[in-house]
């Protein structure tokens, strides 16, 4: 029998405070445990199949914020999709995102995958970006954006596919 943890029940023992390991529950809480920069081990998050909104997402997105230990967000197989939420990075470095489809993003940021500010050494590759929920502006009928990068350096976007997007790749 194969038992897999879900995005909301997966656990990891990580050094959150510098006083030893604590158990974090859920994908977002595990990522948040890296924010205080006490944990130095790299983290690989692997997803399989259709992933709907995790229970704890800031503003409707999976958020990588102030992480420097190195995180890989990886889809396993040919059908991994983040359905109904996006992935946002802020103030982070050494992040890899690969082999994930993004669709129906309905978060407050509005981007399937957004590098919002002060990121460096980020690689987004072999991903599929589909349209999101309509935004408030006339040019946002199919969502705000698919893959947006703002005030970030040493970023590579490679071998990605954009499907029926109104806006697809902002660099600013």
Segments predicted by a language model, with ranges:
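Conserved small/polar residues in nucleotide/adenosyl-binding loops
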Residues: 1-6
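Short polar catalytic/cofactor-binding loops
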Residues: 7-11, 20
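Extracellular beta-strand-rich solenoid/capping regions of secreted or surface-exposed proteins
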Residues: 20-41, 53-72, 80-98, 104-120, ...
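Generic beta-sheet signal
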Residues: 43-45, 152
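Acidic, glycine-rich low-complexity segments
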Residues: 46-49, 72
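Right-handed parallel beta-helix
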Residues: 69-79, 93-104, 119-134, 145-146, ...
């Amino acid at each position: 029998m194969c038992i897999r943890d879900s995005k909301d029940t997966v656990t990891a023992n990580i050094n959150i405070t510098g006083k030893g390991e604590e158990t974090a529950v859920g994908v977002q809480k595990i990522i948040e445990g890296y924010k205080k920069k006490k944990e130095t081990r790299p983290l690989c998050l692997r997803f399989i199949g259709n992933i709907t909104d995790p229970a704890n997402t800031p503003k409707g997105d999976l958020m990588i914020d102030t992480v420097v230990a190195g995180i890989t967000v990886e889809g396993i197989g040919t059908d991994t999709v983040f359905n109904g939420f996006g992935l946002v990075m802020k103030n982070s470095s050494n992040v890899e995102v690969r082999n994930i489809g993004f669709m129906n993003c309905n978060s407050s940021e509005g981007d399937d995958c957004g590098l919002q500010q002060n990121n460096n050494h980020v690689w987004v590759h072999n991903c599929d970006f589909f349209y999101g929920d309509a935004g408030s502006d006339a040019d946002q009928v199919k969502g705000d954006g698919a893959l947006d990068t703002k005030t970030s350096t040493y970023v590579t976007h490679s071998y990605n596919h954009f499907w029926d997007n109104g806006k697809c790749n902002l660099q600013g």
